[in-house]
Curated annotation (Swiss-Prot):
Gene that this polypeptide is encoded by: nutf2
Domain of life per record: Eukaryota
InterPro entries found in the cross-reference section: NTF2, NTF2-like_dom_sf, NTF2_dom, Nuclear_transport_factor_2_euk
Segments passing through the bilayer: none
Cellular compartment(s): Cytoplasm, Cytosol; Nucleus outer membrane; Nucleus, Nuclear pore complex; Nucleus inner membrane
CDD domains, per database record: NTF2 (cd00780)
UniProt keyword list: Cytoplasm, Membrane, mRNA transport, Nuclear pore complex, Nucleus, Protein transport, Translocation, Transport
Protein name per Swiss-Prot or TrEMBL: Nuclear transport factor 2
GO-annotated cellular components: cytosol; nuclear envelope; nuclear inner membrane; nuclear outer membrane; nuclear pore central transport channel; nucleoplasm
Any Pfam family matching the protein: NTF2
Protein source organism: Dictyostelium discoideum (Social amoeba)
Organism taxonomic ancestry: Eukaryota, Amoebozoa, Evosea, Eumycetozoa, Dictyostelia
Amino acid sequence: MQSVDPQVVGVGKQFVEHYYGIFDSNRAGLTQIYQQQTTLTWEGKFLSGADAIVKHIVELPFQQTNRKINSIDCQQTYQPGIMITVTGTLIIDGEAKNQLKFVQVFNLASNNGSFLLINDFFRLVLD
């Protein structure tokens, strides 16, 4: 049985750590991650382009977020790129009662030795 390339997993985990570090400390700083060609589907709402995406994220109705990551799965894609699926719990405004399970999928495309975020999907997992 083949396994996933450890380098792919390493890049994926580094991206996730970097992304959530910015999301949880300064959402407006996500302009350095999202591109003009990036698309985001956030809870069924489709957004395109860095400006629209970051505006939506900055305007979310909570101030502070932290998260507990349950799993990070990475897989190399055809381009070559990396598909990353994250599951976890989102903790809103530091409140134990405000914990929501989520899944997020990132699609990174290779670009001259680095990676660009091309697609992002975010969905809460409601019971």
